[in-house]
Amino acid sequence: MPKKISRRLQELRKKVEERPYEPKEALQLLKETATAKFLEAAEAHVRLGIDPKYTDQQLRTTVALPKGTGQTIRIAVIAKGEKVNEALAAGADLAGSEELIEQISKGMMEFDRLIATPDVMPQVAKLGRLLGPRGLMPSPKGGTVTFDLTKAIDEFKAGKLEFRADRSGIVHVMFGKTSFSVEDLLINLKALQECIDRNRPSGAKGRYWRTIFVSATMGPSIEIDVSSLQDLKLTEAA
């Protein structure tokens, strides 16, 4: 059964032309179409020319958003001994060892990011069925399996995000809040674009970037001209 589109969204869609917009113009329109009764996220949806069923065409990495995410990130850390105290001193919201693993196994999910030291990963691996579907399983590629807990916690609190291409080769990333200025959103979006280009999978063939759309959480999709975004220098974005 087709999903019913709200009258609010129908009206907002009328403001968006079916064409690729220049980056700044698109982000201004994104802000104008953020009319929900809560502070919406600014989202990017990037379709890439990859087939993630092949290991050399998978994309999973992290990006540090220069202007932050606009969110308060709750971080949990699983470690042993003094590393637990180090994590708490560095600003982790939760930290523990076997007892924290047990709490999570019983359904406690009061965190947005889970970091683990390499020596506890055999125990953490048992939580895969719970953590995997939620995108919370620690991984070296995601920067969430490390002994350098202070650095990892600082980076994620400051605006570091992990993202991956889904089965269709589409990347969905939140790159700020609609309360951000157009300039700050553009700086974050440019950082995301450069990160995706830097981490192009070795098996990607042909045209890598297919499309990029941005939107507010409850707003209409707005297409951005890929070449214009790639050609933009960060000094221009600033």
UniProtKB/Swiss-Prot annotation:
Binds directly to 23S rRNA. The L1 stalk is quite mobile in the ribosome, and is involved in E site tRNA release. This is Large ribosomal subunit protein uL1. Part of the 50S ribosomal subunit. Belongs to the universal ribosomal protein uL1 family. GO terms for cellular component: large ribosomal subunit. PROSITE patterns: RIBOSOMAL_L1. The keyword Ribosomal protein applies. The lineage of its organism: Bacteria, Bacillati, Cyanobacteriota, Cyanophyceae, Oscillatoriophycideae. GO terms for biological process: regulation of translation; translation. SUPFAM superfamilies: Ribosomal protein L1. Pfam families: Ribosomal_L1. CDD domains: Ribosomal_L1 (cd00403). Keywords: Repressor, Ribonucleoprotein, Ribosomal protein, RNA-binding, rRNA-binding, Translation regulation, tRNA-binding. One of its GO terms (molecular function) is tRNA binding. PANTHER family: 54S RIBOSOMAL PROTEIN L1, MITOCHONDRIAL, LARGE RIBOSOMAL SUBUNIT PROTEIN UL1M.
